[in-house]
Amino acid sequence: MRLIQPIFASYSTRDTGLGEDNKIFNAWKEVNERVKKDMDLGVKEFLLFYIPEYKLGEKADTHRGNEGIDSHKFDQVCVTAASLARDIQPQCRLIVDVCLCSYTQDGHCCIVGDQEKTDKLLAMSARDIYTASGATVAPSDCQDNTVKNIRATKGGGIDIMSYSTKFRSTFYRGWRNAMKIAKGIHRPYQLDVHDREGAINRSIKYSNDGANELMVKPGITSLDLIKPIKEATGKPCGAYQTSGEWLGIGAPGSLEETYHIFKRAGADYMITYGARRLARHHRQ
């Protein structure tokens, strides 16, 4: 089972609440250094989250809202993320998260009420990141058309890791704090935890749309879905150990225990904030 380490990057360094190892790094000064250290430990894959300096359309003296979001400004942010991806891509496998939630002021993964604009921005983001860096793109937005549109835009060359079975969950709280995303939002496009059949079918849909790899999230509450998803699609499926899961790990040996549980469930990869810690442990 492969280990994937999330990396947070922005214009400045600050704490995430997810531990010193998972702080937000300065995109231009510290990310390369952190990646090199992790690779020395044995980590070979990284999931990049890019946090813009400002929400799109946001100004210090204006009310919050998404009225100011436009394709040109969004494209500039995506190019910045792609430039960072290009700098570290030759050293490792880099996966770049694709979503709108860190850019929109209301914290939604879409432009509410404007599906056409949502589809355009997400496809443009993936296109620019891939064109500039060759990185794998990981759409996490849970919109119906994203994977299909990315595949149509860039054809067979682009590698897509889809957050294909992603539930509405309380286990995301630490990540949303780190990304400065508004709390208390109901996201109907994310799956209901009660809906097993719908969860499996969502991964089948994204597989048919052209995703290369699939995912369940949160990890520990979705492990029962990995085997049926893999059997239905014939594609790799991994699990994301979310920030809430990570923050709940405290006892000695508990991280290693969850690693073996994910592996036992058949996960092809595990995204975890403790990837570097696990890699260090395995080397010892």
Regions picked out by a protein language model, each given a short descriptive name:
Residues 2-4, 10-284:
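Alpha/beta enzyme core
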